[in-house]
């Protein structure tokens, strides 16, 4: 058994803004099945639906005010909640204020999370002591710096969910963040004259993981490394990719309370009809394509706007759920007003996302980059074939309907490359051809629903990594 302190800025079902929370929330259960014991340290945000707990650490002054770490159990998760009201008990989002601007003290807020994690690793939480610390993204990146300051040799593993966010702040905050100025150099946490929490984590980690093997390789290139490609090439021997899994109990077409449950391809028909009615779409001869996404250029929404005429002209439909860039929201809504087979709902609705997975024929993920992606895994589970860009985890989890894959009866979706509107338009054309061939389409849906999209394989790899890395 390896005892692991997992450190993250969010964790489902407590608090969530994206897929990071789902992974952090699912990992403890997956690892428990293999005998490992995870406790998850997260900030105590104002919106968090848990109170109380046993105090296992206390700070008189944690970057501007008193704080405690409280141990409790919630929905099967062993949690350590960092209660620091001056940093986390405020209205607005986890990372941004009510006006969409980053909180000006984000550096201090997540330095506090890392500092508390190092303290728990060094001093323990009651009679519990971690063998390894597993941090997620830049918000946990300063953990190895604080471990070094405490003289603690507990190994640190960093998982990169999205390298686009570095957690950089000005060098004038060295003292305020209680960092060793002698380590402010290119070999530690200095990055172009700034303090970089992500670089600190990358340089201080015993092992680095990211959420797919293709993304691990992409990260070492200037195109995808977001400025950290040189650091990652330097640490390439410590870098590996482990694809995320999904919660097979939450995402289960046989038991999902949000849908008409089904076990085979034929069961999707009732859900498709219900989804068309919910979106105000009539019955159509072509495939119903669904998109559940943030509406940003990174997610390829501009490409969709330029290419979806192909599927609409061939009798298909597109249903969109998401929010994001105002200009893209407006473009989609205006197109929907003019296109009877395009329907758009701005916002996010978890229950509706389940109904879209059950009722769609195809799930669209045209992202310009996608470290892992969970949406395509939900689609596979529900027999909603993914149409995806050839990047990151999308490349690793979808078997393209190439002639060879179709001949071998292993195809589970459609990939397109390069990531352009023209290539996406061609992919829509291929989609319509495949959908018209009912025998081939049915075989692909059956293949998709048999794919191992849970945590078993990924958990086995983390189990081996924890065991190899843990303090002996």
UniProtKB/Swiss-Prot annotation:
InterPro entries in alphabetical order: Glyco_trans_1, GS/SS, Starch_synth_cat_dom
Stated family: Belongs to the glycosyltransferase 1 family. Bacterial/plant glycogen synthase subfamily.
EC id: 2.4.1.21
Domain of life of the source: Bacteria
Job description of the protein: Synthesizes alpha-1,4-glucan chains using ADP-glucose.
One annotated GO biological process: glycogen biosynthetic process
Residues engaged in binding ADP-alpha-D-glucose: 16
Enzyme class at the top of the EC tree: transferase
Pathway: Glycan biosynthesis; glycogen biosynthesis
SUPFAM superfamilies for this protein: UDP-Glycosyltransferase/glycogen phosphorylase (SSF53756)
Gene: glgA
The keyword Glycosyltransferase is annotated on this UniProt entry: yes
Entry GO MF terms: alpha-1,4-glucan glucosyltransferase (ADP-glucose donor) activity; alpha-1,4-glucan glucosyltransferase (UDP-glucose donor) activity
Protein name stated in the entry: Glycogen synthase
Record keywords, A-Z: Glycogen biosynthesis, Glycosyltransferase, Transferase
Transmembrane segments: none
């Amino acid at each position: 058994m390896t005892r692991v302190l997992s450190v993250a800025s969010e964790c489902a079902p407590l608090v969530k803004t994206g897929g990071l929370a789902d992974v952090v929330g699912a990992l403890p259960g997956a690892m428990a099945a293999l005998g490992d014991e995870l406790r998850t340290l997260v900030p105590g945000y104002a919106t968090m639906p848990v109170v109380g707990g046993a105090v296992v650490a206390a700070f008189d002054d944690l970057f501007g005010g008193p704080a405690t770490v409280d141990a409790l159990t919630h929905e099967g998760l062993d949690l350590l909640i960092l209660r620091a009201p001056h940093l986390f008990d405020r209205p607005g989002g986890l990372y941004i204020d009510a006006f969409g601007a980053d909180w000006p003290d984000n550096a201090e807020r997540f330095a506090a999370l890392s500092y508390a994690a190092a303290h728990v690793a060094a001093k323990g939480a009651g009679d519990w002591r971690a063998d390894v610390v597993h941090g997620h993204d830049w918000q946990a990146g300063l953990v190895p710096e604080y471990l070094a300051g405490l003289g603690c040799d507990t190994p640190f593993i960093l998982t990169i969910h999205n390298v686009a966010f570095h957690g950089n702040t000005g060098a004038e905050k060295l003292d305020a963040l209680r960092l060793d100025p002698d380590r402010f150099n290119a070999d530690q946490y200095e990055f172009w004259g700034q303090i970089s929490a992500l670089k600190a984590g990358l340089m201080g980690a015993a092992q680095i993981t990211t959420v797919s093997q293709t993304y691990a390789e992409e990260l070492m290139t200037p195109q995808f490394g977001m400025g950290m490609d040189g650091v990652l090439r330097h640490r390439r021997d410590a870098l590996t990719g482990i694809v995320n899994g999904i919660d097979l109990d939450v995402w289960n077409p046989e038991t999902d309370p949000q849908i008409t449950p089904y076990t085979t391809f034929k069961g999707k028909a009732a859900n498709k009809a219900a989804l068309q009615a919910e979106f105000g779409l009539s019955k159509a001869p072509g495939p119903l394509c669904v998109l559940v996404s943030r509406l940003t250029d990174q997610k390829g929404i501009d490409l969709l706007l330029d290419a979806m005429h192909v599927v609409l002209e061939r009798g298909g439909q597109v249903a969109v759920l998401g929010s994001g860039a105002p200009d893209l929201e407006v473009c989609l809504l205006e197109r929907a007003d003019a296109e009877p087979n395009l329907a758009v709902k701005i916002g996010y609705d978890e229950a509706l996302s389940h109904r879209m997975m059950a009722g769609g024929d195809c799930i669209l993920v045209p992202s310009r980059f996608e470290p892992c992606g969970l949406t395509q895994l939900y689609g596979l589970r529900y027999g909603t074939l993914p149409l995806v860009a050839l990047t990151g985890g999308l490349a690793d989890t979808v078997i393209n309907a190439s002639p060879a894959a179709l001949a071998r009866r292993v195809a589970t979706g459609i990939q397109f490359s390069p990531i352009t509107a023209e290539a996406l338009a061609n992919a829509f054309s291929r989609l319509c051809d495949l959908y018209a061939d009912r025998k081939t389409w049915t075989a692909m849906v059956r293949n998709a629903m048999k794919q191992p999209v849970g945590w078993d394989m990924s958990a086995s790899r983390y189990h081996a990594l924890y065991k190899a890395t843990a303090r002996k």
